[in-house]
Amino acid sequence: MENDEAFDRLIRKIQENQKHPSFEGSNKVLHLALSYLNTNRQNPHWVCDPKLQVAVRECLFLFSFQNDNEYLVWFKKHLNERLQLCPKCIVKYHQSLDDFKSLCLNIFHFDPNTLEIVMEKIYSWDIFRLQEVLKTVPKIDTSSASKPILCAFYEILYSPRILHNKEIFPLFRNRFLESGFLRLSKNLVPGVISLLFSRDDELRRWACSILSDVKTISDNEFKILEGPLLQEIRSLDQKKENENEMQIFLKGLSLLLKHVDHLYFRGLTGKNFNVADFILSGLQSDHTNLCPSFLVCLHSLLYCYGRNFWTPEISPSEVIDKIFNGNAYKRWTEENTSNFSNDQKAENPFEWATSLLKTISIIDEVELINKILINYTMQYKKELEVGFKNVQLLQSLADIFSVLFSEYFMIFPHSDQSLQNKVFELHSTLAIKFDELFRLLNLENEESVEWRLIKKVFEYRLNLDLYILKQFYCHYLDRNRKPPLNIKSVSESFKNFWVYLQNVFREEKFFMVRIVFRACSTVCLIDKLPPKKVDIPFKSDFENALNGFVATFSEMLIQTQCWHLSAQTQLVSNPLTFRGIFSLVFSPILEISTGSISIIKSISLSDSVVDTIGELLRSQFSNTLNSSCYVLLQWLKVRNFGGAKHIVYFNKLIINTIFDSVDGLTSKDATFAKQVEKKESLKNFWESLWKFFTHFFIVLPTWPVHDKDNLVDLMRDTLDFCDMLINIFEEVNGFIFGLSDNDIKIVSANDKGSALAMCIADSLVTVSYWLKLTDSSLLTSVVKVICKMLKICKKLECPISQNVIDIIHRASITSDEQTILTFTEREDLFISLTPYLSEDVLNHSPFNDTNTLETKLQSDDRGLLSKDQTIGIAKKLPESNISTSNHFLLPPKAISASKAINRNAQKSQNLNFLKSKQETTQRIRESAKVPRTSAGNHLSEKLNSDNHIPKALQKLDSADPIRKPSLLHTSKSYSNPDDKNTSTSDEDTSESEEESSNGLFSLAREANSHASKSLPQRRQIQFLDFDSLKTKNVVHPTQLRRNTQQSAQLARLRLNPDVQEFYKVILGWNPLADSFSASNVEMQCVQAKFTYNDSNAYEKVFKPMLFHECWAQVKSAVEEKQYPPIDLILNTRSTVDNFVDIYFTSCSPTEVSFLSDTDICLLSKSQSSGDTNNPKSFQLCKIQSISRKKESLELCLRMNIESIDLQEYAPNIRFTAQKLFNATTSLREFAALKSLRHLPLSQRILDANVTRLPSNFTDDKKQKIMKSYGVNEPQAYAIYASSVNDGFTLIQGPPGTGKTKTILGMIGAVLTSSSQGLQFNVPGQTRKTSKNKILICAPSNAAIDEILLRIKAGVYDHEGIKFFPKVIRVGFGDSISVHAKEFTLEEQMIKQMELTNLKKDQEANNSSDTRKKYDSIIKKRDSLREDLEKFRSTGKNSSILEAQLREITKQKNMLEQSLDDMRERQRSTNRNLDVLKKQIQNQLLQEADIVCATLSASGHELLLNAGLTFRTVIIDEAAQAVELSSIIPLKYGCESCVMVGDPNQLPPTVLSKTSAKFGYSQSLYVRMFKQHNESACLLSIQYRMNPEISRFPSKFFYNSKLLDGPNMSAVTSRPWHEDPQLGIYRFFNVHGTEAFSNSKSLYNVEEASFILLLYERLIQCYLNIDFEGKIGVVTPYRSQVQQLRSQFQRKYGSIIFKHLDIHTVDGFQGQEKDIIIFSCVRSSMSGGIGFLQDLRRLNVALTRAKSSLYIVGNSKPLMQEDIFYSLIEDAKTRGVWRDLSANQFKNSKSISNVSTHLASNNLNLASRDTPIKSPSVGICEEKQEAHKVKKRHNIDSANLSRGTERDEDIPNKRAKNKVSTDQTAADNKVTKPRLDESSSSKQDVLNKIDESEIEQASSKKPGYVEKNKDKGHMKKSKKPKSKLALAAMAHGFAPPKVEHFKRK
């Protein structure tokens, strides 16, 4: 504050003193100034501080005193210190001196002489202090101590007077040069200008360097510095005679002209100095040595003035003449030849010509240009002749050509017709003069001076021809352009200059070849002109030029291929050269494309395009993608068909090579995407591709009409490419914005990914226009692509233009008559567009199923359905009504008034549709949150403003939705132009339209081509009488269409429900937890009910039980570890929807054939990878895909993990995966649960409603059915009921009652019944009557295969005529019986494709021959290369070898092309085969009468996608299937479901105790049976068991309703029945002891030992009978099975199990044996009897035997249970209960006694060859089917994982042994009519089947029972055939003598 007051006082005093000067006032001012400075003596900036500067200026008055006083000494000391520190203070100090001088003169009126004395005193002090600094400061360095001398340097240069002081200058020069060339300040100081003209060379050079770095100095700025220059100008007259001083002046002037604004020099004219006149006059002087300096000055002058140099007084031609004709220039160029300087740093005296050309109009001064080029070229040539290369002259020539070429390329595109002659003249001048110069050059290597100078111009010269060629081609593509006129000169250039360039390739001059490739890349997409019927004037000239280029350049490519491999590799090491060669690969011209790809193949060491692309991406990823971006950019300039075709092909290869899920670079190498350079390259590539798509769909309609088929293929490929890119969007997004080198965890890329999505949104603008296509296949692809694009845009909240929204919306709501879009496609479009639609639009949606919309919109993760997944409801138009030759032709507008009526009608109809739920639409819009303003609008504007865009889009936009062709009448508008039936005039018209059209897609012909055609007279609208239609049972077409649409909606929801929840739940489980549902209320089980209110209630019950069952499978699999672990290494990961897909590689040799997709696996970290005890180290996952390689396995595992846990899954970490179970069945059951509400039988399922049995089963109907199908009465009733009932029909089939035969009868009845209903046929349509199709299912493969084999033998129709329906078996091949394989879909398809496979083999042979030729050519080429190298090294003439090598290379290229074509054809064939395969599969399924599958396999994708409808579904063994499995086959529109089963036999196997507890083990059959058992049809006659065996089951399990077939006692009679201890039916009371095994299952050793004795008794006593496969041992417990097998194996060895079956009860269901031994096991009085109390299990055990049943158990504990009490009491009552110990049984009767007893029997046992006779039981005795034993089959994989309670003996793979015992009983009069010969041999066929099965059977499978021609009888062996019998003999058992068996 005080400081400011002091300054204010100083200022006031100064002002007072200046107004009234006085001595006292001046002293007061000095006192105040000194005081103020003293106060601020700590401030180092006295002078540059504005306030202190005032005080300093006032203190300068101290120098006016005569003597130095103490004040002046103090002031000089402190001022000197500050002037040594601050350059700014120096400047202000000298300005203060000027101010001080002004004050002294003007204010204080000093005497000039006095003032001069004062100023001199100050000057002397300045010289003194600077001298001191220069003398005393040590050597200059970077320390602060050097600052004073640096400030001294600056002050000296700032003041020229000080600089030129005689005392200062020498001292300054020495110290300044000592310090080097210092740069003191950014601003110029006058001393620099002064030194510019100094005679001291070093200081002058320093000044020149300082001035060279300064930007242009303005007029005003330089006036401050002009003093030294003006002084030099004034002394010019003295210097003119001194050449050295003139040289110095001219050099300085030249430099100033380059850096000072021309306005300053114009101002010098007023000072009597005209720079232009001075320089031009100097060129006219006789000073030859000064000529170069004046020319340099002229260059600087022209540079400074630019076009402002020229005035009316000065013209360019005059300047040229003055120079070239001047004596000085002539003498200088003539006398100084070879004396020119080649120092490129020196001023170039020839450079003025370049500056001159930049100041004139090139196009108007071609003659002047010609003069300069001639003069310079001749001068250069003259100097070359004397052996001197004038580098400066060549530099100027290069600069001149560079300027001219640049100007030419700027002028050419904008030149009008008036300038084209001048343009042509300039073109010719440039080409001719450069070619002359080029031939003078000796370009040895890349380092030569000539090449460095001429390199850029050489590239210009190449582009000169290529640019014209490209412009001509672009003119052809766009007729609006004016063609250039000098194409002929280009043709000559290709014949001359370009041919000369071939030497460059021959001599392997890399540096020039690189430029050639780079230049030629600009025409990489130019194509030959297609033939046109209308000739174009310049066409032949263009073709000549193009052919010349192709011929020359293709020869260059051949020459390059002749190089050594190392040379070719070196060539492409340069990125720009690589881009040039790679871009030429895309060329539509075959010769260029083939030659270029051959070079890249060579350096990639591969011979296929695919391998080459892969190698390029591995080694040069960024270069490859950048090169492709360059090609895409080039295509945007030409937009031609040929280029687009190659772009799509090669870029698809690139994308596939990078992102293929199996072989892609990102899949194989997790670190591949970490380089920032790669990320940026891929981002640019992505953007370029979508920009290409945007323009592709614009220009597509403009391409020539003769390429129709090719256009179809190209558009299909392009749409597939779009689809591919959309599918990998997440991978691309992760690549670009995901992991990088420094990242350790994944980065969320959604925000950044929106930039990528915007590219897609921009392309959506043009793709949407193609919704009006008339090619259904392409239209399907367009719809799929658009829907996927919309999905991505919605996910990333990308805005879409309103125009696009309107287009898609109009297409989605267009009626069927106006578009060929199917209902499904329109629905897909509408659903995908929903987030962008308003509330009002959504409320008036034509898709009136609210549940449909809600379901689809909520399942955002679902993929869109493809067209082949939709139901086949789309109306197919007759081929005759649609032009097949023009797939894209958009039909003309319908100029019909009825159109408006239809639209209004449609609108009113839409209003009646159901509205979507408000909360659904609100949620959708909120989730999208997409602003209505669109970034896509700018693209539309840009596209519309492009002059090259055709009007096709405008016509597309204006055209109304396309109507379907009328089916009522044939219209010429839609007829095929190539149709032979059309008239000649129509052909002419079509032809002319083709000629005049811009392309295949043009709409230009709409208005004109049909304007003259008269419209057919329209019929008046007539209203139908709906009442009359109802009475006639006719459906109105509108209602029919509406019904069809609704059916389609329901079908889609039935077949493809959203199942993401299934995997979300399962994959979210912790496999180490005890339970998964403890905290989840939704997963708490509730008791199953008999009926349900709705599907939601049903789902709440069954969904938790289903997941509990899955959880039980998980826990069981984790404990058992059935499958070996697989070691994996993590590669990479990606996010898909709400899951994470992680890709692994396994190099483990572990066999992995057991893996398949949908497997649930346990993934854990390897021991070496971290803490395996961490729960997060274990995760459930699903196999998404599997790729098996020769040495490794590649897996994609899908997981449901939190993003925070992703860091646990980093690349290269080792994991272990172990398969737990296959989730296919559970997944299909979940899908069935989700689709229940949409099933036709949904309500019947919820209500457990069973259709009542028909009451009109008259005797006539009964007798007819029994006669036609050969069945008994209850079977006939069941057949009749199933054929007339809708809904559910229950057939109860107890054991042996002929269920299979009944099913065959149902099949015949359903397939041969005829529909009597009337249908309304739409006029013009032929409605095909859909034939009845049957879907037959069962829980197990064995049951299905049994039915299938019976169908194979034939089925009877309702007239009793045998026929053979078409049958298809669907399912997993390994689980299907060998004898049913021929019916599988795969086998049927293979037969259909055999012919195609032969063609493929032929193609493979051709490829092999070509490969051999190619290998031979390669060897020859390599040999020639070696010989050529030797010749060249020895200097021999190698022209012959070079010619041979070129020819060999051409052959190699042709063979390579052939191999690539073959590979492409092979790939195309494979693609076509895949399509054909799907078509054949679909056709086979469509044509099949019967489809057989397990319940799980009925949900196979093949059936889901085939669009089939099965009105009738038959489920066998329905009581053994869980309820959800029974629902799976009902999703195909089933209206009648026949369930065949037995509720008294085993229930479904369920692993989860919780699920079983709440009723999950109750089948749908049983639930319905319990509700309506009176409606079940009972098959009451059994043909399996001996009456003694069936008596108890019939009484206790079937209320005595199960009757025996006729003569069953005789049929099942056997020799051992006479043995008193054996007999037919026995209960052996064995007092054994039960025990627990390690697995908590029970076993009984005593019972096992007794059964062994019982078996020995049988085989010892009856050695003449082959018991192989006849005996089965059944027990409820698995440990007892192991105990039995152990004892039998110890006794007989492993061979025993080929003759004897030992299984659990569950494993024996469905099988039958002659003898069954049942081990009860339970012997404890306190523990109960466990599983034995299950009536169904006991029923199964007791009903497996045909002839004998032996029960082994402990009676006392068993009788605690009511059922066993009844069983044992019944046995005792019947006298079949035996209380025997093992010893008692062993010794009960000797073998001889038994033999004697048998010998006395009346049985006919005369010889061993005589069979045991028993009467046959059947409808017809002579045709009776025999008893046979089928080997068991593995059940369907779907049921492998099911089980029951923990200690029950349930096998993982339930064995099924279905037996063909469906024999029926009927009256002897009833016979099977019209039996063919094949029927008589049916048993023989089955016998052969059994034999072949035995040959392939394992040791555990049952044997085969040989049968003779007399069906039903066992055959005696000629000798003891049983190996078991032989084994018994070896242990001391002797067979009875033959005499015992002879009849007495």
UniProtKB/Swiss-Prot annotation:
The keyword Mitochondrion does not apply. Residues 908-999, 1824-1944 are annotated as: Disordered. Disulfide bonds: none annotated. Coiled coil: none annotated. It is found in: Nucleus. Pfam families: AAA_11 (PF13086), AAA_12 (PF13087), SEN1_barrel (PF23576), SEN1_N (PF12726). Residues 985-996 have a biased composition (Acidic residues). Residues 916-929, 939-949, 1843-1852, 1869-1891 have a biased composition (Basic and acidic residues). This is Uncharacterized ATP-dependent helicase C29A10.10c. It comes from Schizosaccharomyces pombe (strain 972 / ATCC 24843) (Fission yeast). The lineage of its organism: Eukaryota, Fungi, Dikarya, Ascomycota, Taphrinomycotina.
